[in-house]
Amino acid sequence: MEKGDGKMIIGMQEGAKRDGVRDQRIAKVVELVPPQRLLEELPLAAERAQAVVRGRQEVVDVLQGRDSRLMVVVGPCSVHDPVAALDYARRLSAKSEELHEDVLVVMRVYFEKPRTTTGWKGLINDPHLDESGDVNAGLRIARKLLLEVLDTGLPVGCEFLDPITPQYIADCVAWGAIGARTSESQTHRQLASGLSMPIGFKNRTDGNIQVAVDAVRAAAASHAFAGIDDAGMPAILHTTGNPDCHLILRGGHGVPNYHPPEVEDALVTLGVAGLPERLVIDASHDNSGKDPEKQFLAAGDIADQVADGNKAIVGVMLESFLVEGRQNLVPGEELTYGQSITDACIDWEDTASALERFAAAVEARRGS
């Protein structure tokens, strides 16, 4: 993998330490590449930009019920190997084309990994898998991969964790998510209000749905907050609000919430809040205990609800890679190609089977 080019800023750091007040726990400061420079080095270009716009509109149409297809956001828990991720994308693109009349496939391409305590923080933060924190290289690798995935014909979905990251990659993204640990965060609600694509808010890790519903309402409003502009300069960003935010059910504290009674409760909560009674269900996380076999079963249960005529379920999320399960990242040990180093995933064969089942469910729903 390529190395970043950020230079260390030493003078400011030493001056800060000498006054005995500032930056006493900062080891070093490294210059971050400005967004505009990275966008010029790795341009979206007209054809790719048109694909992103088209993908966003298709997602919106599904979320708003104008398109009867089911959106399926599917891909690795968190990308650690761009080569394997692109291999996966090419297989997924072929399957997407086969099922495109019934399923809108969005590839999950996650680069930032929220941690409950510590651990690998994702490709952008640690692209070399060695805790070196080479964020400049991580941003380049991430953007390059997004462009390559777009070239396969797939729209892209990302989780947004760091509020600065979107300036580097958001122009490539058709759908975004705010995770369970950050749905309650004002910073992320403000961020979502200014993003140019639909954003899903997950229910909290304890299963609380109201927090995510409140987040959807908050992100629909306009906000002003501190961020950076394309030149990398500090700026105050004024947003118009995002009308395309929605709820994602992901279970909580080991208890799933994808079964019909929990889905109905969530729809009632949305209705009381004055929001459209439509939602996305994450078949992984606490809806499966991060167990690939249970995730596959959860996907089947969700497909059955769709087949039975439930039009409120407009999307599903799956954690999927080439090889089932997960592996530990151990220094000096070779990694299994195509297997997750974060949450356990279903393998490619089960992924293809799940997509086919979702497509059949949509056909049944249309006829119900």
Go through each PLM region and give its residues.
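Internal helix-turn-beta structural module
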Residues: 321-366
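Polybasic, low-complexity association/targeting segments
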Residues: 11-30
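Conserved phosphate/anionic-ligand binding catalytic regions in large, soluble enzymes, centered on
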Residues: 71-84, 343
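Long, contiguous binding/interaction regions
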Residues: 7-13, 49-52
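N- or domain-start disorder-to-order transition segments that initiate the globular core
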Residues: 25-64
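Conserved, mostly hydrophobic/aromatic
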Residues: 75, 281, 347
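Active-site-facing alpha/beta catalytic cores
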Residues: 18-22, 102-258, 262-263, 285-286, ...
